[in-house]
Amino acid sequence: MANRRQEALEYHAQGRPGKIQVSPTKPFKNQRDLSLAYTPGVAEPCREIAAKPEEAYKYTVKGNLIAVVTNGTAVLGLGNIGPLASKPVMEGKGILFKAFADLDVFDLEVGSENPDDVIRFCQLLEPTVGGINLEDIRSPDCFYIEERLRETLSIPVFHDDQHGTAIITGAALLNALELVGKAIGDIQVVFCGAGAAAIATAEHYVRLGVKRERITLCDKDGVIHAGRTDLDPYKKKFAQKIDARDLPDALKGADVLVGLSVAGVVSPAMLAAMAPKPIIFALANPTPEIMPDEARKARPDAIIATGRSDFPNQVNNVLGFPFIFRGALDVRATKINEEMKMAATRALAALAREEVPDAVMRAYGLERLRFGPDYLIPKPFDPRVLLWVAPAVAWAAVGSGVAGRVIDVDEYRQELEARLGRAREVMRGFSAHLQEDPQRILFPEGDNPQIIRAARVLADEGSAVPVLLGDPEEIKRAAEDAGVTLEEIEVVNPAAAADAEGLARAYWERRQRRGVTLREARARVRDPLYHGLLLLKTDRADALVVGADMYYPDAVRPALEVIGAAPGRKHVSGIYMMVLPQDVFFFADCTMNIDPDAETLAAIASTTAEFVWRLGIEPRVAMLSFSNFGSVPQAGAAKVRNAVALLHEREPSLQVDGEMQADTAVVSSILTKTYPFAKLRGAANVLIFPGLDAANIAYKLLNRLGGAQAIGPILVGMARPVHVLQRGADVDEIVNLAVLAAVDARETKGH
């Protein structure tokens, strides 16, 4: 514990104190930028907003800015520590808003325990922010503050301590009830705790379908019953006419326990008295009302959730507030109403039933994760939550009449994808175009779980027609283990193919003078990789992707044997598409040619440029060296110069030049001012390296240290689209390469 305390203190103190900062979003490098950012240029947007207030969303950060407001009277696990001491918590909230939903935050700690002061403070903030997240304000003040602000403000206000827990446990409840086979209108629910979160959650459950008279709340004084005279108006709504007076009595025969109180107040004996297949949400933090292993021992038939990350079914409010505000602000909602909260609950419940991406399982160190008793709600670090919850909330705002603008849900989802990273945006654009003409993609490693999951993604998106090659029973078994259906995914068994003899003869005719006998050809055709390559060779498929279980050379060699280089080409090479926040670059050759001569370098540049054209991007090719346009008379630089000369002669319309240093290539001002004769019109987007060592080092450094996403390797120069994965590729990497293979195949056929 002492080590954790010191670690936490060092985390907050190291470098710049605290956890957040304000960063400019516009250039600010010279006098011109100063005159635009501030006086006199700043007067122009001011005039526009004065004439038309909604223009603030166009010219300022208002539409992406949240105020996190507290007075520090009820900080989780710490109590009333005051506004200043609560500031680290509010800064942490700001990090979560930014990391999960790309929302900016001002954390504002109000120096008053008077709820009317907090209300007035928030009212005065309305011109500044797009929404207000109330945080760590004691009950019942929090109810009064939120109600008054909802009545008086025209921006969304949301008390996360109340509604976040309600929304997320609501999703868990819906899914748990499906698993135990109980109807929501028949269940008996007991709350251990009767604070803001418990009351808001109980109200949310009523809207989901739980009968109010079947909900029992217990506070520190026992059951909230009709005979008590110490209840505030919010607790009175749940005062039941029942005989039970304490938590053990209330839990007898109950179907659901929702713990929102303190550690250790629930015993195994209490759980033993609950109904069959109980649902237990023990949500006190950091230590729950009863530890999950203890609860499981008492009730093996129970479904259990906690607020902890080290047990299944973590109920974490980060699944709610970032995405709810994202959706609300993006349609300029005037409030967050019950329809929007309900939409968030149902979106989370539905997402938990979807197949879990490999990247999510890898983030949590899991090999398998599927809907069931140990997976009721999505994991907090599942990037799909943004794509499910925010659109659901936004559309609910539109449907309930509180939105200031209407959205196209599909377009909005694509905008959200872009917030998750430039690579997702780029690949989504390719996928969308392929849906009109999906290509048939062969996967020889058909029983590989990652390949199967990737095939499922491709089939669901409609961006390709995946074909798995291998033993059908093994593929079926692997799919079942991975929790993936094979619907709309074709399975081909090379060992029982009706056309095996024809394919064998085709391969034999190609390789008979390379030592291959007809008998050997017949044997190889039963191999999924050779079978797939021959299907591709004979135009029965559009592309092939392989390598998840193979070393790169072992996958490339058969491809060269069967498919070979494209007509007129002697060399194949490997490209990586490097995706940065603002730019996309293509690096070559990263995988094939160790020390290419001038002729080979020219071929690498030519085939790379062809591929980039097929993606719909105009290539601007820089031939890289340590020298700029003959500045160093050395053999290595001369090799690159000679390659450039060959390209200028053979492809005069191609934007290519060199030799040049890397900064000359990517900084257009260096190129245009110092080397105005260069054929490149602007910074290069295709970088051809002088050798494999430089290319391989560069792409890996940019990926690991520069934060670029590397998509590839993309094999170019082949007669047909064959692409070889890095061994151990994850689902996203397989999908990305398959999409690029499909684009390559479609565009190749079109020419």
Region roles according to the model:
Residues M1-V157, L351, A396-G399, A403, ...:
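N-terminal ligand-binding/catalytic initiation module
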Residues L65-G77, G82, A166-G170, V180-V206:
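Glycine-rich adenosine-cofactor-binding loop
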Residues L84, D136-A183, G404-R405, E415-H751:
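Anion-binding alpha/beta catalytic cores of soluble intermediary-metabolism enzymes, centered on
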Residues D116, E178, R228-A273, R511-L536, ...:
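A structured beta-alpha segment of the ubiquitous adenosine-cofactor-binding alpha/beta core
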Residues L134, Y205, A244, L260, ...:
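Conserved P-loop NTPase motor core
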Residues D160-D161, L177-K182, D186, A282-A390, ...:
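Adenosine-phosphate binding glycine-rich loop
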Residues C192, L208-K235:
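NAD(P)-binding Rossmann-fold cofactor-contacting core
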